[in-house]
Amino acid sequence: MSGTPEKILEYLLDTVSLETNYCNPTDSFLGDFLRMHSIFMPTAQLHRALLTHYRGRDPGPEEVVVQEGMAGRADPSVAMKEKVLHLVTQWVSLLGARAQEDPAVLALLQELRSLVLNDAELGEHAENDGVSYNTKHETTRNTSVREKLRNWVWILDRVPGRCDRTGSSPREREPVRRSERGSSASVGHGHRLSVCPWEGTHDPCPPPAPQGPHLGLDTLLEGYSSKELANHLNAYDWEIFQRIHELDVVEHVVGRGEGVSGGGRTHLDSYLTRFNLLQYWVVTGICLCAHLGRRSALLRKFIKMAARCKELRNMNSFFALMFGLSNAAVRRLSLTWERLPSKHRGIFQDLERLLDPSRNHWVYRQTVRKFNSAYLPFLPLLLKDLTFIHEGNKTYLNGLVNFEKMRMLSRVVSVVPRCQCNQDVSEPSLGERREQTLRVSLRELRGIDNQGTLNQLSLELEPPRDRGPANPPTAK
């Protein structure tokens, strides 16, 4: 399928059903368009096109005669307006809080709101259309136009009203209401949640300076089982993953659309950063453990954590742990691996098969295909798939939008919301003091990300055994 952006939108409005939502797996045209429109149709252009379709045009004399002969039937102009409102409603539902970041979206919502409230034609049509309720006072699928508009205007009243919730200045503060709950979940990256007197006017304390990697990780973790560690790790990973918006994934690959403010750190960036931190946290912990026995025990614990992450369907942390264990600075520690029980060496070899990149990571893809519930995907591979599709297919063919490319991109992106559905993970309780220590350790991972430094630490732990003396004695 290909066409100009305007023709694709026109075809969508002609064919879309008012019962279709953007996440419908059987009819994905609406979702594909809303997810990918920024690639070929910037928001400002979509804004103008939607208003044009909503306003329509004055009918000519011949069309008036035809409309008079169709008395009692649905007015096609009213049907088009309903479809425009339905499309925008689904768009706002997809964007969520992101609608606050785009001035073009806010301008469209405000202008459409004004048109809806002043549209006498729709108001008259709504009065002639009945509303049916069931015994639970829920509207049926034949909800009247008036009810749809009432709900739609309710959405419009609330989206722009929250635009000033985010501070734009480093010294700008927004007090939390006394009645507000769950405030920490709404704190974005680049912001801090500080506790200070309600009447206080002073600046909160500055954040603590970042410290180096944890020393004695073996001592810190020896009081916890690998299952407890993996469960807490999984709970925090889900906490971050649930905040990732599917459009963050699109923008990570193709860039942000025109007119979209921000461009700062997203939850996806934090998730990817945590993947690298977890990987080097494992390598650093092993390379900083000087005692051979403790180092082997730490290696065994990390292997069991990786196995537990696989059981929890946390493939992102599973890959991070396995990449850490497969790092060159760790793999060369032959004395450490020799002290590992054969059972755990076998477990590691079985888990290592999932890392096989051959046939486009066929083993991993077959594994996750068998999961019948939500799981944490290996996001770097998902981003690689998107990049391959984006760079391997032209956006325009002969001046027309290659919408088949948009379908392929949307199909991969839709994995994110599908994986986020129906997942409720809570952190296990270990007692207040133990839980607080573990929470800080797993949520503030630190590690050495310089491979040269890690290799040097590894060499100091276990010098090469096959190498002869650096300066062999000369013959006499």
Predicted feature locations:
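Short acidic/histidine-centered micro-motifs embedded in hydrophobic/aromatic stretches
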Residues: 49, 53, 108, 321-325, ...
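Extended alpha-helical coiled-coil scaffold domains characteristic of the BAR superfamily
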Residues: 302-318, 325-332, 358, 372-375, ...
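Hydrophobic residues within the alpha-helices of tandem HEAT/HEAT-like
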Residues: 37-40, 87-93, 131-136, 306, ...
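Alpha-helical solenoid scaffolds in large eukaryotic transport, assembly, and signaling factors
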Residues: 1-83, 87-101, 241-244, 249-309, ...
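Alpha-helical scaffold repeats of the Armadillo/HEAT/TPR superfamily
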Residues: 53-54, 102-117, 339-347
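Long, hydrophobic, amphipathic alpha-helical segments used as structural scaffolds
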Residues: 95-99, 103, 120, 313, ...
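Intrinsically disordered, proline- and charge-rich regulatory regions
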Residues: 118-255, 261-273, 289, 293, ...
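Long amphipathic alpha-helical scaffold regions
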Residues: 58-73, 329-358
